[in-house]
Design a protein with these regions (language model features):
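Non-heme Fe(II)/2-oxoglutarate
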Residues: 1-84
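Catalytic core of non-heme Fe(II) oxygenases with the double-stranded beta-helix
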Residues: 67, 71-199
Length: 199
């Protein structure tokens, strides 16, 4: 199943503007008690930390005030896959360094239940970080069917500034359960409208 990593995704000016805006003290962030809450983890194998989030697009509806910040990312994705892309969801996630540190990962999940075949998930990293994104071999069309005790790791993506990882949305993934320093990523869900060049 399709999985790619692209480095040096966007130009330096766009990257600097995005970083400066998201790290600005007046940028609006919204608190979520858990980063993932739709997956059953009865055996307590994972830990879903609190997260601050800012939404750029939800269910195809774009926030016109700040969406322009991530347009260079989407334009570069379209160029890489040689197809127009149609945004579904896009948000920034901010994990803060916490007194609660754990080796556990965040709860494995997919971003969209019942997603169509042409739907993809991507994570764009704004800065270097030690804590990886974990990509699993398993796929699903619903978070409610994930058996977290039976997952096997396909790869770990180390966050590097201006790096993008992309895969088909049914592939299960997870973030770190805690971080040593503030970690911001842009999470994107979108449709690729022409699959001819997807391998």
């Amino acid at each position: 199943m399709f999985f790619k990593i692209y480095d040096n995704l966007i130009d330096q000016e766009s990257l600097t503007k995005l970083n400066d805006t998201l790290f600005d003290k007046f940028f609006p962030w919204y608190f979520f008690n858990k980063s993932v809450d739709s997956v059953n983890d009865q055996e307590n194998l994972f830990y879903s930390p609190p997260v601050l989030r800012h939404c750029f697009a939800l269910n195809g509806q774009i926030d016109p005030t700040r969406f322009f910040l991530i347009e260079p990312v989407l334009n570069s994705i379209a160029e890489k896959v040689q197809s127009n892309v149609e945004i579904v969801n896009a948000h920034a996630n901010l994990m803060m360094a916490s007194a609660v540190t754990t080796d556990k990962l965040d709860i494995p999940h997919i971003d969209l239940d019942g997603c169509p075949e042409d739907c993809y998930t991507a994570i764009f990293y704004l800065h270097d970080s030690k804590e990886p994104t974990v990509i699993y071999n398993e796929t699903t069309d619903s978070n409610s069917t994930i058996d977290v005790s039976k997952l096997s790791i396909k790869t770990k993506v180390i966050p590097e500034k201006n790096r993008l990882s992309i895969w088909r949305t049914p592939r299960i993934h997870s973030a770190p359960g805690s971080v040593a320093s503030p970690r911001i990523v842009i999470n994107l869900n979108f449709r690729i409208l022409n699959h001819a060049n997807i391998v």
